[in-house]
Amino acid sequence: MKVPDFIKWAESVQKEENRIMLTKGKEYTVSDEDKFKNFKSIAERINIEPQKVALIYLLKHMDSIRNYVLSGVESSDEPIMGRVMDARNYLLLLGGMIEEAMDNR
């Protein structure tokens, strides 16, 4: 892929990732102002840190991506690019949680 084509593609993927983040964010924050409410709620229920919840969600997508790379087969109803975009969004969410934790120290 030529550099200009890659940049154009990457910009379109980032736009879609942002759309997904906003759409799914509404579902999981339940009109709360805390972007990480869902992770914190689950973490509290099972007595682990919110960052670990995000890592578990990320790893679920990474396993799917790994299986696709190794087999070349999509084994889910969700297209592989959807998994890649979700993984990148979980990295952003995890980064935000790390930033929040560092700010609270």
Predicted features and spans:
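Intrinsically disordered, low-complexity regulatory regions
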Residues: M1-R105
